Amino acid sequence: MSIGIFDSGVGGLTVFREIDREFPFADIYYLGDTARVPYGNKSKETIIRYSLECANYLYSFGIDALIVACNTASSYAIEALRESFDIPVIGVIKPGVELAVKTTKNGRIGVIGTQATIKSGSYRTEIEKKGDFTVYQKPCPLFVPLVEEGLIDHKITELTVKEYLDDIVSKGIDTLILGCTHYPLLKDVIKKIYPHLNIIDSSKATALYLKKKNLDLNGTGERKIFITDESPSFEKLKDLVVGSDIHLEKLELSKICTL
């Protein structure tokens, strides 16, 4: 049995890593749409089209579950994906929210993400369904390019984190949802600056959420990672996040656009 995972770039590898740990015998196929990263500044229509194209390619492997390892795509394209494919389609928003509301002690939850994810209000909507919580949101558009360029431990990243987060942290939040799958790669930087925060990694939450589905996902343990454009920074970060054993395979963008 097999799992398909897609994201606009390298961020979804944090989900791949957690799925790999929880389902060591499943076949896992990952598609990073590096030719069109980021999705966070695209229109809703474009995000849906890109998501359907990525999902359709992964579906051609006969996958049994699809993980939308992109918060932007989870915000805008999840319903279109569920209508288009006859397998479980799991986004990263609901699992992260469920963990956050269980974790917070004072009911003040911060959410950071791309412009598109924050604008969609997806996290606020899901959190408010769970009860009386106060939600503070902040778009952090520079985080994705910083991660994609491999500047995880750079001084400029620390300064950018403070510039974005000082305001919502000052509101008294005790829990922060990393509302983009790139952001767990900045978790150590964020924790260093704000050690008191409970940081919710939606990647791990999503893997645990899938585990609760009790799907028969035993296979041969095959692992494949595809990208739609050459990216030295992706390869470097892939080695950091999931190791160097898995070879990258480049797809021509036209191949997924015409399926």
From Swiss-Prot:
NCBIfam families: glut_race. It comes from Persephonella marina (strain DSM 14350 / EX-H1). It catalyses: L-glutamate = D-glutamate. Substrate binds at residues 7-8, 39-40, 71-72, 181-182. The keyword ATP-binding does not apply. Pfam families: Asp_Glu_race. GO terms for biological process: cell wall organization; peptidoglycan biosynthetic process; regulation of cell shape. This is Glutamate racemase. The keyword Nucleotidyltransferase does not apply. It is an enzyme of class 5 (isomerase). GO terms for molecular function: glutamate racemase activity. Provides the (R)-glutamate required for cell wall biosynthesis. Its EC number is 5.1.1.3. Keywords: Cell shape, Cell wall biogenesis/degradation, Isomerase, Peptidoglycan synthesis. The gene is murI. Belongs to the aspartate/glutamate racemases family. The active site is at 70 (proton donor/acceptor), 180 (proton donor/acceptor). Gene3D superfamilies: 3.40.50.1860. It comes from the Bacteria. SUPFAM superfamilies: Aspartate/glutamate racemase. Pathway: Cell wall biogenesis; peptidoglycan biosynthesis. Signal peptide: none annotated. Transmembrane segments: none annotated.
